[in-house]
Amino acid sequence: MEKSQPLSEFFSKQLVDPVSDALRSHTCSEQEMTLLESAIVHARDSLLEEIQRSKISEDVTQTVDCLLSRVDELLEETRNFAPISPLSSEAPDILPAMILFNSLCSSKSLDLEPIEIKVEAMENPVVSPPIFSSDDSVKGMPSRKRAKRSLEDTVQMLSKENSVSPPPPSLPFVLPQIPVPIPFSNAALMQRWLGHPLTNPAYLNAMFQHQPAPKPSEEQFAALMKITMHAANFMKTVPQLPVSNHFTESDAEDIKIDVESDEGEIEVSPSPSTGDITENESSSSSTGPMISPNCGDGDCALEKPFICMHNNCGKRFANKFLLKKHMFIHTGLRPHTCPHCHKKFNRKDNLLRHKKTHSPTSAHLGPILPKNPFHGIPQLPVLHNIALTQGFSHFHALKMSLETGATAVRSLS
């Protein structure tokens, strides 16, 4: 207070009074008044900050001096007492008890039962340094004792003394291993869940790999048979649709269906005017059974024993394979489908010839027939897990068509 009184008087004489007199005698505008106010506020803040800094630095200096003096006193007291290290070889009986006690204290979070350890009285008790309270240290703290010593020197000295501690001796027994706690509320339930086979990914993969595929039910199989019969009957009654207007001669050559004429087969080709696939004049104009004029009845019966029993046909063939190929004309079945435009063909070589139109060299050619000409087919029910091969469906349709009136029989010679 004695030092602060002269400073306040000095501040009033040197700064407050002259500035107040100058402001009273000077008339300033609003702009100058604003600038002067900001300058006064800035000077005030600077002075207050400087006063606070000096006060804080003085407090810090006193605190550091007190800490240094207290550290020196503690070092002197520890040198005078010279306690025996608990890990030294002079007290080997207390080592197991101390290690067990430390392990129990570190595992307080585990649900372990308390263990009572009885330690016998030692002949040479360990003398610990006296513990000083904070109140006693504050009361006995000197003001300016050894102020020149820095805190770094004391810290270095303490670190050197602690680094030269003797290594702990080897233990004559094996310490018990404490299990790591499971981070869940119910440890027993978690252990049981981890041992379950459903938590093993290898077990789950093996179970799903060996699981058999579900078999179709009787209702699904019956529905599939009804769909096949409906498709076979529908193919007979479907009218042939006209070809679109952009049908050209080049397109007609690409999709020309050439049935081999060997062994008595006929040739059919699309008509440019109507787009229908018709037979040759020799087969379409005949009203009765077709008999070749170049051979007699006996020769034809021996060489071509298989006869087409379709209405107004009566054509003969040498084997059943040629007869089945011929039946495609009457039944309208086309088992080979183009994967690009979904167009159907009765022979595979015609499909391969048609696929060339979709190659990059002939990409300018557009579709010849519409993708879905059969708009009258009703919506079929959805069947799951039923995979029926394409050959089986075509064979079933051909069999149904043959049973309705186009049965091929071996002629009696």
Swiss-Prot record:
Residues 130-151, 259-290 are annotated as: Disordered. GO terms for cellular component: nucleus. InterPro entries: Znf_C2H2_sf, Znf_C2H2_type. Gene3D superfamilies: Classic Zinc Finger. It comes from the Eukaryota. SUPFAM superfamilies: beta-beta-alpha zinc fingers. Keywords: DNA-binding, Metal-binding, Nucleus, Repeat, Zinc, Zinc-finger. Pfam families: zf-C2H2. Its main location: nucleus. A zinc finger (C2H2-type) spans 306-330, 336-358. One of its GO terms (molecular function) is zinc ion binding. Residues 270-281 have a biased composition (Polar residues). It is found in: Nucleus. PANTHER family: KRUEPPEL-LIKE TRANSCRIPTION FACTOR (PTHR23235), KRUPPEL-LIKE FACTOR 15 (PTHR23235:SF120). This is Putative zinc finger protein B0310.2. It comes from Caenorhabditis elegans.
